[in-house]
Amino acid sequence: DIGHGKGSFSFKVAKLMLENNFQPDVISSDVHKLCINGPAFDQLTTLSKFLVLGVPFYDVIEQSTVNAAKALNRPELGTFKVGSVGDVSLLRIDTGSYDYIDVLGETLAGDRKIELDGVVLNGQWWHTA
């Protein structure tokens, strides 16, 4: 579990991990008042960092949803199966010039960023970003 917050997650370690074919089981964030303004910011920024590091979008989403639900022993989450919780985040990948920062202050330039378009909770449209 990545658990990106104020004290864990460096690009150097993440790159070494990925270069050695060691994918994270779970990509999560540990956002709190000391890191909400950086370096973690939010879950989508954490996911974007892995996208820019070369992890395919499908894997990034699976590691943040399906695998996270399994790690929490919550099989009703992280799936679209009939009878499961009807929660969905509608995401898009924006392209441009983005700078990402890790807990050591190192930066990574990227050309993609995952953004939120809307949210469905319990099968009901809840929010448009």
Where are these regions (language model features)?
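Structural detector of well-ordered beta-strand residues that form the stable sheet scaffold
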Residues: D1-G3, I27-S28
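Active-site glycine- and acidic-residue-rich loops that bind
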Residues: I2-F11, A71
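Short linear motifs at secondary-structure transitions and domain/linker junctions
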Residues: I2-H4, Q63-N67, R92-S97, D102
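Hydrophobic alpha-helical scaffolding
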Residues: G3-G7, I36, G54, A109
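Basic, gly/Ser/Thr/Pro-rich low-complexity segments located predominantly at protein N termini
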Residues: S8, C35-N37, G123, T128
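His/Asp/Glu-enriched, well-ordered alpha-helical/loop segment
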Residues: K12-I93
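C-terminal cap of metal-dependent C-N hydrolases
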Residues: G86-A129
